[in-house]
Amino acid sequence: MRQSFRTGMLVAALGGSFVSAAFGQDRVRIGVLNDQSGVFSTYQGIGSVISAQMAVEDYGGKAAGKPVEIITADHQNKTDVGVGIARRWYDTENIDAIFDLPNSAIALAVANMSEQKNKVFIGSGAGTALLTGEKCTPNTVHWTYDTYAYGRGLGKAVVAQGGKKWFFLTADYAFGHDLEKQAMEGVKAAGGEVLGAVRHPLGTADYASFLLQAQASGADIVGVANAGDDTITSIKQAAEFGLTQKQKLVGLILGMNGIPALGLKAAQGAQIMNPFYWDLNDGTRAFARRFAERHPQKNYPNDMQAGVYASVLHYLKAVDKVGGAADGKAVVAAMKAMPTDDPLFGKGTIRSDGRKIHPFYLLEVKKPDESTSKWDLLKVVATIPGDQAFRPESEGNCPLVKK
């Protein structure tokens, strides 16, 4: 039935059977589309599917009087594969909404397709701020984070904590350049100073020459504007060089899942920005324990996986409000009209451009002697209100925003 792409499991929300070949509209059908076998699989993957399942179960398994069902697939980080899956889901399998979607190119294509077919796209793993900017649609909600918040918001937050002088270690390709640009603008806007930057090729194995330039810069903060294995390798080598004895590392895209690979000895003192951490309060801790019980590796949830849970909950509330899932534009309008409230992100709102607003946290990696368990990795340094973390609605050039 699905020869042209790799598919994960098809899940009936509360343990029911496989959906019939007719794919009838006797149920609400949710698709979780993400990387389940590649570089982002640890960060979303099966964890996002688990989060969606938990949300459906916690909501009661039905919306607008119909059972809610989840289907999932691996887009393999290939645009043609991801777009092909989304089109098949919409055209032949009556999927009402697609969630998660790390990989900005696929996310932008699916957002456009969702508008054309009057479906719903809710991005948690997607990063590009274009989803609520020039490429916004009335059928899209961008839930968890974006490049503006991670770059510019983090720069401002660290300067406010006293990190005034910056030097950037940046991956030499479009993503790294954009991340560096956003962070630089945040630093300067907050009154900080950028002393310089050095660019490294994707997949660099030896960072010695780049780290020597960072050490010699005299900066208080070294902003690490790369991702994945590059982040792990560069931060490990920075610790080995002794750079962290006099300078603080700020990982612009270092998430919780990357820290165990680094080890607390190498990562200690590094700062990151995130809208969710499992140890924030009783609600986040309870969710994390339930999540870990289901996860094959017993991992705790990260922000993007938490975002899938929260966004599925709010989507189901909107489906109930509208009385069905068939009219995607009406469902998204209802999502925007209702305040958001869930145990992971608390109370929030969705703006007219589709941007979900919630606080971010400036977090610092704990020292080894401060950690009491495998996932006890971070401590909160500061809280950044959502209206300060995300791009102002007036600056995004979203055509849905009234001038």
Protein language model regions, located:
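Extracytosolic ligand-binding ectodomains
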Residues: 3, 8, 23-403
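Bacterial N-terminal signal peptides
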Residues: 8-18
